[in-house]
Design a protein with these regions (language model features):
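Extracellular, repeat-based ectodomains that mediate carbohydrate processing or recognition
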Residues: 26-484
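Hydrophobic alpha-helical membrane-insertion segments, chiefly the h-region
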Residues: 13-26
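N-terminal Sec-pathway targeting helices
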Residues: 1-13
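Cleavable N-terminal signal peptides
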Residues: 10, 21, 474-475
Length: 484
């Protein structure tokens, strides 16, 4: 969930403890005594916006239930591409969005983490809505176990921005998400059966949004990049003891609002984060001006960071679906690292204001210090966005993106075995042609949520996950597809 419609510079230092308690009256948030500290940290207007949007989604969900348009309403017909199993929905009736996925590189475990609006509560009372839902597969995504709540997290209004990774050397599973605007970390030693008590990563930073994270191969070094309370500056939360304790570093101090979409810890310990940034100085705090594509990196365990702007693009075609904000399709740059630490960044943007976006790729063989010329990965003149990327082996990269070449959205897959010098032809993996009110043979109406993800199983097979819906408002669902 990208906070983009209300942009504030909160009147506290990025490293100062918030001491003011905010209260909402009327139909707004009712503060619970035990949770006033967390509410104060989030900022009144941001929390109210998040709460109001959730209420809008719950109303749309209730309406869809009454009208019989929620979830799967007819047989799902598929037309899988060769080598693919066919698109499937994670839950037939859930209002699910913004999924994350991780695959164990040494065992056939795959994990999908997403949040759900209006689902069965995780606890008897004072439970978050939306709440984090975990699904685990023991066979590379062929079959899936029962849904589990990652954390009941009582006295939290809503959980957002799920992230999940597998520690390569141990198989331990790490997760990061937001309780309201408080970013937390938890880990599982037993393939998602049990989870540690969530640990806050934010220290004295007043609130955080849009986290992205990565871990070292042994799981000791964990880096969470996110935007903070000073007008969207970049912050880093850093742990060198497998997530038990955290320190925070402010990375930027500028006039732009940043969003983290990719993070990698390279074999030599270098940390790389890919982000885009906006200025929200237009009417009603709308985005205006160019969109910058950034690479941030650290060679000293997160103490200091360098920045490179690798491209400058324009805000593209505006989103006009219900509840949507104009720059929703201006999604951020995905990052893939292979086993040697070579990198590919995949991002999108328009060449002229409100024009169609193109998805581009660039590669780096020196840890993100320098980058190749950009290569277009999506068709010219067709609006494209929502890239995801994963590395595998030596120089192998798997990506997907979504575009509107049919007049509706579809998800397309491409791969490269030479670090992005050449790419396979695009294959449609959103191949279900029926089943819900928002799907037909041309595709689905709206991408649901800011992002999805792609992963590679221990057998070298690709598995990808994303959200689809009738509008930005929803209700929609999480879908996935996998290579056979």
């Amino acid at each position: 969930m990208r906070l983009a419609r209300i942009v504030l510079s909160v009147g506290v230092s990025a490293l100062a403890v918030a001491t003011v308690v905010f209260a909402f009256g009327g139909s707004g948030i009712e503060l619970r005594d035990a949770d006033r500290g967390a509410e104060a940290r989030g900022g009144a207007e941001e929390l109210q916006e998040q709460y109001d949007e959730t209420q809008d989604r719950l109303e749309a969900l209730a309406l869809a239930r009454r009208q019989g348009t929620l979830g799967v309403i007819e047989r799902i017909r598929r037309a899988p591409a060769p080598g693919w199993a066919g698109e499937r929905i994670v839950n037939r009736t859930g209002d699910d969005w913004e999924p994350a996925i991780a695959a164990d590189p040494n065992d056939p475990f795959v994990y999908i983490l997403h949040n759900r609006f209006g689902g069965e509560p995780a606890c008897p009372s004072n439970c978050p809505d939306p709440a984090m839902i975990l699904r685990v597969s023991k066979d590379g995504g062929k079959t899936w176990g029962a849904e589990r709540y990652l954390c009941a997290c009582r006295r939290v209004h809503g959980q957002h921005d799920p992230l999940i990774e597998v520690v390569p050397q141990t198989g331990e599973v790490y997760a990061v998400w937001m309780n309201d605007f408080d970013i937390h970390f938890s880990k599982s030693p037993d393939h998602g059966k049990t989870w540690s008590t969530p640990v806050p990563v934010y220290g004295n930073v007043a609130w955080g949004d849009k986290p992205n994270f990565a871990t070292s191969a042994d799981g000791q070094d964990v880096y969470v990049l996110y935007n903070g309370p000073t007008g969207g500056d970049v912050h880093a939360a850093i742990s060198h003891d497998a997530g038990d304790t955290w320190e925070q570093v402010r990375v930027t101090n500028d006039e732009r609002y940043h969003f983290a979409y990719g993070t990698a810890v390279l074999p030599d310990g270098r940390v790389v984060s890919t982000q885009n940034s906006f200025t929200y100085s237009g009417p009603a705090s709308a985005a205006e001006g160019p969109v910058l594509q950034h690479v941030y990196s650290s060679d000293d365990e997160g103490k200091t960071w360098s920045e490179a702007v690798i491209d400058t693009l324009e805000l593209g075609t505006v989103c006009t679906s219900e509840l949507c904000y104009a720059d929703f399709y201006d999604s951020g740059p995905a990052l893939a690292a292979d086993e040697d630490g070579d990198l590919v960044i995949v991002y999108s943007g328009a060449s002229e204001p409100e024009g169609p976006r193109t998805v581009y790729g660039r590669s780096s063989t020196d840890g993100g210090r320098t980058w190749s010329s950009r290569v277009a990965l999506s068709p010219s003149g067709v609006n494209a966005a929502f890239a995801a990327a994963a590395g595998f082996g030596d120089d192998t990269i798997r990506i997907y993106f979504a575009d509107q070449r049919t007049g509706r959205w579809n998800v397309w897959y491409r791969s490269s075995q030479d670090l992005g010098a050449t790419w396979t032809a695009a294959v449609k993996i959103s191949d279900a042609t029926s089943g819900t009110a928002y799907k037909n043979a041309k595709g689905f109406i709206e991408f649901y949520g800011d992002y999805g993800e792609i992963a590679v199983t221990d057998g070298g097979k690709t598995i990808a996950v994303w959200g689809e819906g009738p509008s930005y408002l929803g209700p929609g669902g999480v879908w996935f597809n996998r290579e056979r």
